[in-house]
Amino acid sequence: MTSNYADMKVGRWDITDLVKDPSSGEFSQFLGSIEEQVMQFEESRKILRPDISHEEFERLILMLENISEKISVASGYAYLGYYADTSSNEASALVIKMEKLASEVSNRVLFFDLWFKKEIDHDNASRLISAIPVMYREHLRHKRLVAKYSLSEQEEKVISTLEVTGSRALVKIYDKMTSSFEFTAKLRHGRKMIMKRFDNKEKLMSLVRSPDADRREAAYKSLLQVYKKNSGVLGEIYQNIIMQWRDEAISMRGYRSPISVRNIANNLDDITVEALLAACRKNVSIFHEYFVEKSRMLGMKKLHRYHLYAPISKKAADSKKFSYGSAVETVLNSFENFDPQFRSLAERVFAKRHVDSEIRKAKRGGAFCYSVTPNLTPYILLNFDGLSRDVSTLAHEFGHAIHSMLASEMPLMVFHAPLPLA
């Protein structure tokens, strides 16, 4: 790969590092190896007793991690292929297949998790935790703390099985729908008004940062018109996902509130998060003052929703267009100024061709960094359109990738950063 980043163009990622060909015999053998390891792990149920040795306990954790890594590789390939083209029936079918496999494997090894959470006594659990390598200890302590929210093995299996065709299926339907949306905006072109068609939301939303107020308004109206037209179906998707979340978390598991589920998963207590929210509510006037001042700088009596992201002048950064190559070069130089290792790690992502940066129809919108396993270079999805916010998004997602690579010596069980840290 060339090191002349200034000439780099947007492109697609290469996910063959994960799976060369999902229809090949090699991939079938890979999935078969997962089945063999799961069967071996299932045999460990008979040796789970309070006085199990810490060596045996650690061996089981390592077996479980090995199974999880293989599932992550197969699932990662399926998801990344689907995000690159949500209209692909082949990609969608593979996602369903991998989700079903992951659910089945999870159900078959679930007994170990529930045993450690609920069946072993406090003294023996503490003995095992203190003898295990230090990187696992906090994770295992947290499992014991949240044990009261676990259900019986059979109940957990039912929930896991139904998720594949329940909330996860609804999310895929949402992605397929919204990624296929097409938009038409009425824009001024010289003295004429033209109807411009957009087959991707990302291109349309670039206009909300246009220095032209009419273009910003036209972009929002076009966006909202399409979503309003589909509000019935989208509303049903939202409602059903929310109801499923609440029914499981509150009615079945006994969490105090829906947000408590997320807080506890992030190892935070509700009081801490509520203090943060209370501080935001108390100081909401600061945001009001900001928008009043922005309205004044834009020469508007009132700042409408259409103009929240308006650049304050035609010379502002959001009015400037950046080539992809110059954006990459700017970010890499910034990383190097902070620490040469940051640049080196970011360059590895480009060298591996793990970036999908172009805007195209049916590709998932937004941006993310996807870390599959600790020993694999992360993947980054962008929708680069040349705005300053696209440059900052590039830097942001590569920051996640650098974080993942710096954590590559950690085991999969504790490798991923929790949301508050990420």
What are these regions (language model features)?
Residues S319-Y324, N375-A395, E409:
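Short pre-active-site segment immediately N-terminal to the catalytic Zn-binding motif
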Residues M1-A316:
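A well-structured
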Residues S404-A422:
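Post-HEXXH active-site segment of zinc metalloproteases
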Residues R343, V349-R353, A422:
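Acidic/histidine-enriched, beta-strand-rich ligand/metal-binding domains
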Residues T393-E397, A401, M405:
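Catalytic glutamate of the conserved HExxH
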Residues E293, M297-P340, C369, I380, ...:
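Long, K/E/R/D-enriched contiguous segments that form extended
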Residues A317-F322, D356-L376:
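Catalytic zinc-binding patch centered on the HExxH motif and its immediate surroundings
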